[in-house]
Amino acid sequence: MAEEMIPAWVEGVLQPVEKLEAHRKGLRHLAISVFVTRGNKVLLQQRALSKYHTPGLWANTCCTHPYWGEDAPTCAARRLGQELGIVGLKLRHMGQLEYRADVNNGMIEHEVVEVFTAEAPEGIEPQPDPEEVADTEWVRIDALRSEIHANPERFTPWLKIYIEQHRDMIFPPVTA
């Protein structure tokens, strides 16, 4: 894995830190998460088996860390293209959240996350990069929580946190 510098806080100062170091030390760092929807479904990805943490687990459509100096919307669009071959969707910023979770092998995600959604029209289908994504699946939003409860071992810690604690921010209830 090439050295990748991401924005992380060290002694209260935001500075470039190598990504693996941020995870090993559990440093608070910036991240983005994207949820691509189509009607009442959301696109999930199964992380590639070669990932250094949480391999093979199901996550939201796309999540990553911005490069040092990269803004969140640019990062979100870049990663949607790189991981899933999805380009040109209008990203909607839904808000910011923070979480901390053990992700295995002594790694900790302590992320300040900018959350985005995007609606994918019919005909837009993911073309996953196999180095990043093992599989994809469109899942009904209203069934996702019960699927996570029934099979928690299949899902990343952050997706469980997002759906349990931040579902209404990510998927606001429809009002008449």
From Swiss-Prot:
Active site: 63, 111
Co-factor: note: Binds 1 Mg(2+) ion per subunit. The magnesium ion binds only when substrate is bound.
Subcellular locations according to the entry: Cytoplasm
Necessary cofactors: Mg(2+); Mn(2+)
Catalyzed reactions per annotation: isopentenyl diphosphate = dimethylallyl diphosphate
Binding positions for Mg(2+) per the UniProt entry: 63, 83
UniProt cross-references to CDD domains, sorted A to Z: NUDIX_IPP_Isomerase
EC number: 5.3.3.2
Molecular-function GO term, any one: metal ion binding
Matches recorded under HAMAP family: Idi (MF_00202)
Membership in a protein family: Belongs to the IPP isomerase type 1 family.
Name of protein: Isopentenyl-diphosphate Delta-isomerase
Protein source organism: Rhodobacter capsulatus (strain ATCC BAA-309 / NBRC 16581 / SB1003)
